[in-house]
């Protein structure tokens, strides 16, 4: 199922939740909607689902206008953060619910429903737990049941709203891998909302970065991290050290930092340097090391510049002993934007 969002607008009172949003989603794609609270990502997801209707613009499924069609007519599967499972029903009954409530010729036989439930239990690795109740499951298991229930009706689109937000970090990591595996096995077009950068960059084929009701950038995880198109994306995705300064003659300068900025006109600008883009170099500027902490294969370094600016630097574990006292560093790469 392909999805096209064309110039969609949505306003709540005076608040513009979506501002002329355009988005094309390919058949079978796994897309993340990433942004801070209030950016419009959940409103966009609900508009795709048919749970909200836009004030202007179009929503197309496979080229057909579904802008004002109901959620049921769109055949979407929805997974919420809080699972929304029926406590009085077994796991199997929860998964089968969407099939059980169908009417007439649309309703599968009991044998077909039972077979579908078993297929899904196997898919999400919950075989043998169909007779349990939600209260007897862990948070991660309950979220797998919610995912299975959404898939049971064979939706044209699977939508997930902060699906792992209520779970602890270890379980979230495990379920991220699980969702990717399930997506690849089913091939269903999938869109999920998250404010977790790591989650979006690890899971998605592409990531749409939202801010103030607009899409700032859409691209692969590598593209939005390594080639951010706006200052907001650069500051929001991944870690970055921010420098406010001036561009003059194709060079950006802020304190001791000087980097190329040939594409910008003279004037105020902001530069961002990723922690891993700093390197030790005697030709660079001096910083005083506050702290160097080995973290697995890397060393996390905090340093102070001569003007009191605190920098975060990421280096290899092998270089840990070199980050002590006063050292000189250079920025091998910087992203510079006009103010």
Curated annotation (Swiss-Prot):
Residues 3-237 form the ABC transporter domain. InterPro entries: AAA+_ATPase (IPR003593), ABC_SmlMolc_Importer (IPR050093), ABC_transporter-like_ATP-bd (IPR003439), ABC_transporter-like_CS (IPR017871), CysA_C (IPR041193), Mo/tungstate-bd_C_term_dom (IPR008995), P-loop_NTPase (IPR027417), Sulph_transpt1 (IPR005666). ATP binds at residues 35-42. It comes from Caulobacter vibrioides (strain ATCC 19089 / CIP 103742 / CB 15) (Caulobacter crescentus). The gene is cysA. One of its GO terms (cellular component) is ATP-binding cassette (ABC) transporter complex. It is found in: Cell inner membrane. GO terms for molecular function: ABC-type sulfate transporter activity; ABC-type thiosulfate transporter activity; ATP binding; ATP hydrolysis activity. It is a peripheral membrane protein. The keyword Nucleus does not apply. The keyword ATP-binding applies. It comes from the Bacteria. Part of the ABC transporter complex CysAWTP involved in sulfate/thiosulfate import. Responsible for energy coupling to the transport system. It is an enzyme of class 7 (translocase). The complex is composed of two ATP-binding proteins (CysA), two transmembrane proteins (CysT and CysW) and a solute-binding protein (CysP). PANTHER family: SPERMIDINE/PUTRESCINE IMPORT ATP-BINDING PROTEIN POTA, SPERMIDINE_PUTRESCINE IMPORT ATP-BINDING PROTEIN POTA. PROSITE patterns: ABC_TRANSPORTER_1, ABC_TRANSPORTER_2, CYSA. This is Sulfate/thiosulfate import ATP-binding protein CysA. Keywords: ATP-binding, Cell inner membrane, Cell membrane, Membrane, Nucleotide-binding, Sulfate transport, Translocase, Transport. Its EC number is 7.3.2.3. Its main location: membrane. Belongs to the ABC transporter superfamily. Sulfate/tungstate importer (TC 3.A.1.6) family. It catalyses: sulfate(out) + ATP + H2O = sulfate(in) + ADP + phosphate + H(+); thiosulfate(out) + ATP + H2O = thiosulfate(in) + ADP + phosphate + H(+).
């Amino acid at each position: 199922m392909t999805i096209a969002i064309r110039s969609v607008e949505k306003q709540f009172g005076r608040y513009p939740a979506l501002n002329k949003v355009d988005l094309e989603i390919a058949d079978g794609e796994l897309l993340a909607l990433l942004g801070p609270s209030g950016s419009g990502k959940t409103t966009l997801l609900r508009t795709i689902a048919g749970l909200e209707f836009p004030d202007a613009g179009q929503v197309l499924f496979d080229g057909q206008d579904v802008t004002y069609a109901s959620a049921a007519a769109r055949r979407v599967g929805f997974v919420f953060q809080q699972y929304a499972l029926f406590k009085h029903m077994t796991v199997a009954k929860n998964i089968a619910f969407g099939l059980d409530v169908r009417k007439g010729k649309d309703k599968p036989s009991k044998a077909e429903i039972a077979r579908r439930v078993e297929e899904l239990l196997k898919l999400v690795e919950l075989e043998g737990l169909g007779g349990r109740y939600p209260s007897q499951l862990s948070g991660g298991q309950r979220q797998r049941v919610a995912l299975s229930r959404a898939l049971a009706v064979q939706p044209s689109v699977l939508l997930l709203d902060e699906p792992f937000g209520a779970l602890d970090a270890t379980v979230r990591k495990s379920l991220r891998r699980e969702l990717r595996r399930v997506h690849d096995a089913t091939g269903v077009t999938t869109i999920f909302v998250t404010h977790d950068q790591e989650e979006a960059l690890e899971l998605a084929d592409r990531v749409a970065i939202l801010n103030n009701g607009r899409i700032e950038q859409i691209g692969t995880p590598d593209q939005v991290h390594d080639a951010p198109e706006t200052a907001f994306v650069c500051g929001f995705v991944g870690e970055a050290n921010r420098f406010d300064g001036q561009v003059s003659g194709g060079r950006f300068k802020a304190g001791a930092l000087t980097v190329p900025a040939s594409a910008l006109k003279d004037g105020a600008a902001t530069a961002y340097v990723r922690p891993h883009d700093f390197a030790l170099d005697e030709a660079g500027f001096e910083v005083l090391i506050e702290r160097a902490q080995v973290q697995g294969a890397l060393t996390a370094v905090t340093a102070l510049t001569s003007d009191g600016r605190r920098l975060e630097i990421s280096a290899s574990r092998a270089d840990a002993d070199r980050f002590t006292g006063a050292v000189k560093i250079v920025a091998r790469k910087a992203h510079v934007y006009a103010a």
